[in-house]
Amino acid sequence: MNTNKIGVLLANLGTPDEPTTPAVKRYLKQFLSDPRVIDLPKFKWQFILNYMILSKRSPKVAKLYREIWTEQGSPLLAISRQQQQALQDYFNRQNQNVLVELGMSYGNPSIESATDRLIKAGVSKIIVLPLYPQYSSTTTASVLDAFARGLTQQRNIVPFEFIHSYHNDPLYIQALANTIQLAEDEKLLFSFHGIPKRYQTEGDFYPEHCQQTAQLVADKLSLTDEQWLVTYQSRFGDEEWLQPYTDETLETLPSQGVKKIAVICAGFSADCLETLEEIAEENKENFLNAGGQSYRYIPALNANTDHINALAKLIEAKI
């Protein structure tokens, strides 16, 4: 063990290995089998998942992935690699003995394998940074579960720090604000990934974090209450999810006199299928077809300098 080397584990959701039906099916099976994501009784849910959902959804989702796939592969993985390298470069410039690894809750590279690489490199401490600014049991807690699994075969568990959330971190808020320049008569819509309403009732304070993030950004930009709103996207299944829903809101705004909209997905640290296809394409078409005149998607923070600096400072506070 190198007593001076610090390990950093960047963690995100994950992606299929390739945009094919078999690869997407494997990915969705792992993702949707996580009880943190879907907490229905296991036997009942596995029957529904294997015999009703995967066969229908996998080809459709694979087609959507093919539309956003790049030469570097999945946008989420490519951008996450850029974030990993940018943070490694940052710590190298600071002459800090820090090793940054990347792991995904589902798919490759896994959080378990990233944890193993850090331990084999001899780090004396691991700082786990889930790239989810707003805590949720469906995302952040899944990272903790996977990290714990990565330690199960270790005789010596090194000390670790787990960054729970950073929804109100000043540098993160400033990084978001720096990407937003509203045009005249343009309304700002914060679209966060949804979760079942029941999860909030049972104690998940994710929606509170989302509202706080949006309010802080709006305050930073000196926006009035009429200039912005919060919605939730990507609902799945028949259960009620957090509302208002992004798609329904965008379809009704033009009839309420809102003709110009800018959409930012502040909970996504990297652009992915949900932002590049669902928000930037599908919902744009719906808004314009409903009578909207201008629709602008503001990209995720990805590997931009302000974002990397904000993440680096979060990590440095734990070193």
From Swiss-Prot:
It catalyses: heme b + 2 H(+) = protoporphyrin IX + Fe(2+). Belongs to the ferrochelatase family. The keyword Lyase applies. Gene3D superfamilies: 3.40.50.1400. GO terms for molecular function: ferrochelatase activity; metal ion binding. GO terms for cellular component: cytoplasm. It is found in: Cytoplasm. Its EC number is 4.98.1.1. Keywords: Cytoplasm, Heme biosynthesis, Iron, Lyase, Metal-binding, Porphyrin biosynthesis. Fe cation binds at H193, E274. It holds the Pfam family Ferrochelatase. It comes from the Bacteria. Catalyzes the ferrous insertion into protoporphyrin IX. One of its GO terms (biological process) is heme biosynthetic process. Pathway: Porphyrin-containing compound metabolism; protoheme biosynthesis; protoheme from protoporphyrin-IX: step 1/1. InterPro entries: Ferrochelatase, Ferrochelatase_AS, Ferrochelatase_C, Ferrochelatase_N. Its main location: cytoplasm. The keyword Iron applies. CDD domains: Ferrochelatase_C (cd00419), Ferrochelatase_N (cd03411). This is Ferrochelatase.
